[in-house]
A protein has these predicted regions:
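Short, function-defining helix-loop hinge/capping sites that tune catalysis or transport
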Residues: 16-18, 143, 169
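Anionic group-transfer/hydrolysis microenvironments
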Residues: 10-12, 26, 107-108, 113, ...
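Residue-level signal for well-ordered alpha-helical scaffold segments within enzymatic catalytic domains
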Residues: 92-95, 113, 117, 141, ...
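Substrate-recognition/cap helix-loop segment adjacent to the acidic, metal-dependent catalytic center
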Residues: 94-97, 109-130
Length: 182
């Protein structure tokens, strides 16, 4: 059984040094219909990232968040007591990444780039190699229609996004007849 991981971030900007509000991750086997498993969901300490790590907050992104439904805003910005430090976020993500064959994100220049910058800020190496990186956006663009449109019920929740993206990778592999890891 292959073990791939899907990661998604919700951030306060689109630049590599943007504050990470939430990180979602889920493991899955792209070659089967098995349910994604081993979820990880972390809320980052926004104040620590901004003040101690000098990570950025973009006004346009804040304005975009203000136009989202209230439930989504509450999940992202609410007074949650479980927010973790950068060091703790990276420690838990490192532990979660153990045993992954490949790691996916929705697009090659957002989540991966922001995470790589966060690891660099924390003076830690990323827990994946460059050759393990996979991009779901490109895969979905090759489908007759975007598979996320048919199944995704919740938007802008990092863990929910991961779940739906993992399920769509499975559907895409099945559509294209991909049966092995090469």
């Amino acid at each position: 059984m292959a073990t791939h991981g899907m990661i998604d971030l919700e951030t306060l900007g689109v630049e590599p040094d943007s504050v990470v509000m939430t990180l979602g991750a889920i493991k899955f086997d792209p070659f089967s219909d098995a349910e994604p498993h081993t979820p990880l969901y972390l809320r980052g300490d926004v104040e620590e990232q901004s003040e101690q790590y000098n990570r950025s907050i973009d006004d346009n992104t804040l304005a975009w968040w203000s136009r989202q439904p209230q439930a989504i805003q509450d999940e992202a910005f609410g007074e949650h007591t479980d927010r973790v430090t950068v060091q703790e976020m990276l420690r838990q993500l490192n532990k979660w990444c153990v045993g992954l064959d490949y790691i996916w994100c929705q697009g090659p220049t957002f989540d991966f780039v922001i995470l790589q910058d966060l690891y660099k800020n924390a003076q830690k190496p990323t827990p994946w190699n460059y050759w393990q990186i996979r991009d779901s956006r490109t895969l979905f663009a090759m489908m007759p229609s975007d598979p996320r449109k048919a199944i995704q019920e919740e938007l802008h929740n990092a863990l929910a996004d991961c779940y739906y993206q993992a399920k769509c990778v499975q559907q895409s592999y099945k559509h294209f007849g991909v049966t092995n890891g090469r």
